[in-house]
Amino acid sequence: MDAEMAMGESFAYYWETQRYLESEELDSMYLPTQDDSNYESSSPDGSHSSSAPAPAAVGGDAAAAVAGSGGGMTTMMMGGGGGGGDDAGGANKNILMERDRRRKLNEKLYALRSVVPNITKMDKASIIKDAIEYIQRLQAEEQQMLREVAALESAAAASAAPAAANPFAGLGADEEHEYGHHHPSSSSERTKKVKRALSVSSISDALLAAAAPAPPVEIQELRVSEVGDRVLVVSVTCSKRRDAMARVCRALEELRLRVITANITSVAGCLMHTLFVEVDHMDSVQMKQMVEAALSQLVATGSPLSSMSY
């Protein structure tokens, strides 16, 4: 009878121990926190022991099972703590990498916003959209400029083609025959010779025009008067013709007069040249005679120079 009661108490303790172990295994699935006081070091060598109260009276096998369970849970906690540290370090590294990526993206957006002239909004999508539109507009302007340049080049080539095809277009039939048949060289050499011939002809025309006799100067009035001590005023009026006043000035320069001041006035188809001359021992009559002698070579036949009043 006593043996049966002792066996019943042993089975009761066995089932209580099983429930306790299952409860401890469920609790060990969660990570321990800093405030967790379920486990603490009580031995000098740093070994961990469970602070949970053990059953008051258990058999030897049940106590060994509880002790083994406590050691297993301690090992599980130590391993779980190491895995949590690795996960936290990886998460911090990912956060830093994401921050660096966003910082670089913002810097590029700021640089893009600084070069685009028209920004409608300040958000990222609007900045990128405005930049794309600006680039497309620049590309369209580039294509337009290239088309204009090509049109100008084609027009210049078309205008230069007739001159290159016929370098004798500005010459007569005789000159073209002479330069085309007696000099059957390359087209560039013929073009150079044609240009040389044209320049020679233009120079000869200029020389002929210069050698042609100039029309006579029509002197309408000559006045010489005294305005002060050793100062005379010489006034010559002539008709406005080609090189008339230039020839009068050259004639007066040959007299080597000491001119104080001079001016030329154009009035009603006439040119009037007035000089203020400084003299030493010469009166107005002598000055008039000297000026008349210098201008007599310029006047036309029948000019009233000799009948002018003084």
Swiss-Prot record:
User: Which PROSITE patterns does the entry mention?
Assistant: BHLH (PS50888)
Tell me the Gene3D superfamilies matching this sequence. Answer: Helix-loop-helix DNA-binding domain (4.10.280.10)
**What tissues has this protein been observed in?**
Expressed in spikelets, leaf mesophyll cells, root tip and root epidermis cells.
Q: Which domain of life is it from?
A: Eukaryota
Q: Which GO terms describe its biological process?
A: jasmonic acid mediated signaling pathway; phosphate ion homeostasis; positive regulation of cellular response to phosphate starvation; regulation of DNA-templated transcription; regulation of shoot system development
Write out the GO cellular component annotations.
cytoplasm; nucleus
Question: Bias category Low complexity: which stretches?
Answer: 41-57
Region span, Helix-loop-helix motif? 103-138
Q: State what induces this protein.
A: Induced by jasmonate. Induced by wounding and drought stress in leaves. Induced by phosphate starvation in shoots.
| Region of interest: Disordered | 26-57, 174-194
Q: Which SMART domains match?
A: HLH
One short Pfam family name for this protein? HLH
InterPro entries to which the protein is assigned, alphabetical: ACT-like_dom_sf, bHLH-TF_ACT-like_plant, bHLH_dom, HLH_DNA-bd_sf, TF_AMS/ICE1/BHLH6-like
Q: Where is the bHLH domain?
A: 89-138
Which of UniProt's keywords are assigned here? Answer: Cytoplasm, DNA-binding, Jasmonic acid signaling pathway, Nucleus, Stress response, Transcription, Transcription regulation
Further remarks about this protein from its record: Overexpression of BHLH6 promotes shoot and root phosphate accumulation, and root hair growth and acid phosphatase activity under phosphate sufficiency.
PANTHER family per UniProt: TRANSCRIPTION FACTOR BHLH35 (PTHR31945:SF26), TRANSCRIPTION FACTOR SCREAM2-RELATED (PTHR31945)
Q: What is this protein called?
A: Transcription factor BHLH6
Q: Which gene encodes it?
A: BHLH6
